[in-house]
Each structure stands twice: as C-alpha cells, then as structure tokens.
Amino acid sequence: MLAFTLRFIKNKRYFAILAGALVIIAGLTSQHAWSGNGLPQINGKALAALAKQHPVVVLFRHAERCDRSDNTCLSDSTGITVKGAQDARALGKAFSADIQNYNLYSSNTVRTIQSATWFSAGRSLTVDKKMMDCGSGIYASINTLLKKSQNKNIVIFTHNHCLTYIAKNKRGVKFDPDYLNALVMHAENGKLFLDGEFVPG
C-alpha cells in the first residue's frame, strides 16, 4: 500500500511537471508562428515593428521562371512568366502596405530584374551583380548596400541558392524557397541577423 501511494505521488509529480511544460510551450507557440523548416514566420506587421528598431533586409527569390514553366512568358525567355509578374505585383502591393520606405536591388539576371520591377510598380531599381554570388561574401555585399542606402530598409531580389545558404549558415536550417519566398534580416552594430521567413498577411 505504501509503495502504491509513493508511486502515485511520484506519477502525479511527473504529470504536474509535464502539464507545466505543455503550458509554457503553448504560450510560446501562441506568440510566435514557426515555419515547417524551423524558421520563425514574420508577417507584415511584425516586419514593420522590426523596421522601427533596425534597418531590415528582405531577400526575395525571383518570381516564376519562364524557362521552367508552361505558363506564358512575360517577354524574354530567360525572364519570368506573366503569372509570375502578376504574383510579384500582388506581393509588392501587400508588402508596401506595411513597409513603404525601402531601397530596391536585384541581381543582374532578367528574372530578378523583372520580378523587382513588377514588385515595386515603378520604384527606382539598382542592379548589383554581387547578389548572384552567394557564399560567405554575401554579408559584406549586403552591408555595402545598406551603407549606400544610408541604413534605410532594403529589398533584394536574388536566387534560391542565396536564401538556402543564408538560412543554413545563420540558423542551421534547410530552406528550399519557392518563387517569391523571402528571408528577413536586420542590421545591428554592423552585423546581420536572420530573423525568419517573411509570410505576407
């Protein structure tokens, strides 16, 4: 009987610990959404709040490629599709509802230039070929753009291998971005930090 009582008390203690842990986890989950890849999800409102504290860097993968789709090409076969252009325009409109003040950059490919142009609907675009080369040097290139932008927010249209590299290098996660997926970073004291994946809405 004594052994049963002790075991019952012990089990109740474990149950209480487990219940407490679940409450903590539930609380954290309610405050922060996470992508299936392990990256925090950052919507437009959260991005705007972050931008009030630090200059933000949003790196988008280009829109749907013409040469890898059966959809109608926008123009050049090395560029994006009509659907990709429409998707970029819709995304840019939603993005600008929360972030109006930013400088726009892209790598020097037709698909990134077209994506950035349709995303911004007329905003001035600066093409930088370094946004095509993604390795350890990408951070220095981004910091250079931040300095040129006088620490304003910047939006960069680049490529899937760049986003994959940054996610792996900064957070150790596997990120396989679809068209127009994006990562959010911020600059602080000359360093770049990966905050998560941008999720419109």
Swiss-Prot record:
Its main location: periplasm. The keyword Signal applies. Keywords: Hydrolase, Periplasm, Signal. Its EC number is 3.1.3.-. Induction: Induced by BasR. Pathway: Bacterial outer membrane biogenesis; lipopolysaccharide metabolism. InterPro entries: His_Pase_superF_clade-1, His_PPase_superfam, LipoPS_heptP_Pase. Transmembrane segments: none annotated. Residues 1-35 form the signal peptide. GO terms for cellular component: periplasmic space. One of its GO terms (biological process) is lipopolysaccharide metabolic process. It holds the Pfam family His_Phos_1. Catalyzes the dephosphorylation of heptose(II) of the outer membrane lipopolysaccharide core. Required for iron(3+) resistance. Belongs to the phosphoglycerate mutase family. Ais subfamily. This is Lipopolysaccharide core heptose(II)-phosphate phosphatase.
